Regions:
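Active-site-proximal helix/loop microenvironment
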Residues: 85
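Long, contiguous binding/interaction regions
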Residues: 1-43, 47-80, 88-156
Length: 156
């Protein structure tokens, strides 16, 4: 229905408390980044917002975030979804805190909105009053600046 929230879902999470040297090398982790938190979800834009929030709530860095552009409806497995994100931090407690912040944003804060009665057209208009390190870098702004994250069909 028009103006209804269209919520995203977290599909899978995993914490790696002590990353292997080979994986650390592949992800270009610094020596202080010992632990990882992985998340998959069925909506990439909401998850990018959530990963940024994690960088504000915990001592973590987004070291990998990629969309699967076939979309969640075309995922190759039940838990693959539309995006995978990886947070790195100095210890399991920090990555767990970052992961919890990301999950909270996906489940309770950020969402698309229906623009018509059958929910076949939607938009994402999310105001971020203070960006974290992830979206700041991607948007080319200073960390802590405000950002409007907007996604909509071309004519809307």
């Amino acid at each position: 229905m028009k103006r209804d929230p269209l919520k995203a879902s977290v599909l899978a999470t995993k914490i790696i408390p002590n990353v292997s040297p080979d994986l650390a090398k592949e992800l270009n982790l610094g020596p202080d980044m010992k632990s990882l938190a992985l998340i998959t979800a069925d909506c990439d834009d909401v998850t990018y917002t959530a990963l940024d929030e994690a960088t504000k709530k915990a001592d973590v860095t987004v070291v990998y975030a990629k969309s699967f552009y076939g979309g969640a409806a075309n995922a190759n497995t039940k838990l693959a979804g539309e995006i995978i994100g990886i947070l790195a931090g100095p210890n399991p407690a920090e990555v767990k805190s970052g992961l919890e912040a990301a999950v909270d944003v996906i489940e309770n804060q950020a969402h698309f909105v229906s623009a018509n009665e059958d929910d076949s057209i939607c938009y994402y208009a999310h105001c971020i009053s203070r960006t974290g390190s992830y979206l700041s870098e991607g948007a080319g702004i200073k960390e802590g600046e405000a950002l409007a994250y907007l996604i909509a069909p071309p004519l809307e």
